[in-house]
Amino acid sequence: MTNLNCFGRHRRRTAPHNATGSRSELVAPPIHSRINGWSSPLHSFQFIALLIFSFMAIVAFGIYVPLLPAPWSYAAYALIGSAFVLHLFSHVTAVTIDPADVNVRRRKDYSSPMPTFDNSKHPHVIDNLHCTLCEVDVSPKAKHCSTCNKCIADFDHHCKWLNNCVGGRNYWFFFTAVSSAVIGVILLIPLVLFVFIEHYVNPAVLRTAPQFQTVKGNGTWLVFLPVAPVETSSISLLVVSFITALLSLAALLLLCHLLCFHIYLLSQGISTYEYIVRKRQSPNPKEKQQVPPALPSNGATAQSLELQEPPLNCDAPLSSRSCTFKLEDRGPMPEPICAEMEEASGEHHLSYSSESATQKIAGESVMSLPVVWSLSETERPQASQVEVKPLEGRPVVQDPLGSSIMDTALVHQQLMTEQPQYLHFKQKMP
């Protein structure tokens, strides 16, 4: 099923380039540069901004300001009217101005189609202050806007509410439009609240206009005074006041956020584009917390594990035999190892005491094994002359799975094969 996009660029099917070819091509229509915010395509945010401004102007000067007493109505007309007129002028000016770079406005023909950017020939659209699409030299802070299809001098951002880029030529008109909108909304909210409260507290204060002398009853109100008085009910007046208050509060929050942000940018001497680039390049503190710490060296690991890991004792299942291992890896020792040690020690009629010789391997594990042998009565005088030496530097057997647990049977085999001059046994047959 084919997905249709009404807002995308439509492709037209043309004849093959070669007369002999049978396959047609999909060719996109040429792309032209936009002059200002009134150039097509228009954005939906433009109409939303126009509708909100028109609604607030109508309810302010058609409903609420005429209901004020004579001294206050003149002040409201002057203050709110000045803010609304200033906003309208600056808004329209920011939309109408062409913010393109001076060389673009001098040399570029907006009616000619834009060339296609080839990233195999040029790494960036603007290379060495030369725009490959506009085909002109631009200023250092100029950026090529993909929506307007041209280079903008002192580029700040592309505003959807203006449908135009905000650059060096129209930035202060944009800033004035935002500031005047904030001032106008701040003046409008107290006016709406005053009318809403006085409607219940003292309606006579709002009915001082001469046209109210012909109206009977407090349930009927007049709007669009004094030019075209229209009667309406109290419910309609209150509903419009409630909608106006909510819309004004929402607009005030958004506009104040935008105004404070641009005041901060002006204090830092940067543009919106530069602020976004810095944010992208700065490291994220959350990512720093997720990075695991670097592992210490092997020696430090062995020492820390000696202090932190308690020794595992296999003495519980073996009443007269004990073995102690200090392991590098964490976790309990499996029971088959203790059983294997029991079989190996029982085969040679040996028993371990609490005295042990320690064998250390750099970067690996630390193992404690006893070296005092318990022999029969006839062999004890010979064994008393035996001198037991530590096995410093002897190779040991390591588990092929990467664990630091040592096979006890193989250790006994090394003791039997490598030190026959020290230890001598007679294996008794049953």
Swiss-Prot record:
The residue spans the entry assigns to the Lumenal side of the membrane are as follows 68-76, 198-234
Among the GO biological process terms of this entry, one is: peptidyl-L-cysteine S-palmitoylation
Enzyme Commission number: 2.3.1.225
Q: How does it sit in the membrane?
A: Multi-pass membrane protein
* One Gene Ontology cellular component annotation held by this UniProt entry: endoplasmic reticulum membrane
Q: State the top-level EC class.
A: transferase
Could you tell me which residue ranges are on the Cytoplasmic side of the membrane?
1-46, 98-176, 256-430
Q: Which InterPro entries match?
A: Palmitoyltrfase_DHHC, PFA4/ZDH16/20/ERF2-like
Positions annotated as active site in the UniProt record: 159
Q: Which residues form the DHHC domain?
A: 129-179
Q: Which UniProt keywords apply?
A: Acyltransferase, Endoplasmic reticulum, Lipoprotein, Membrane, Palmitate, Transferase, Transmembrane, Transmembrane helix
Q: Give the residue spans that cross the bilayer.
A: 47-67, 77-97, 177-197, 235-255
Q: Where located?
A: Endoplasmic reticulum membrane
User: GO MF annotations for this entry?
Assistant: protein-cysteine S-palmitoyltransferase activity
Give the catalytic activity.
Answer: L-cysteinyl-[protein] + hexadecanoyl-CoA = S-hexadecanoyl-L-cysteinyl-[protein] + CoA
Q: Does the keyword Transmembrane apply?
A: yes
Q: Which family does it belong to?
A: Belongs to the DHHC palmitoyltransferase family.
Q: What is this protein called?
A: Palmitoyltransferase ZDHHC11
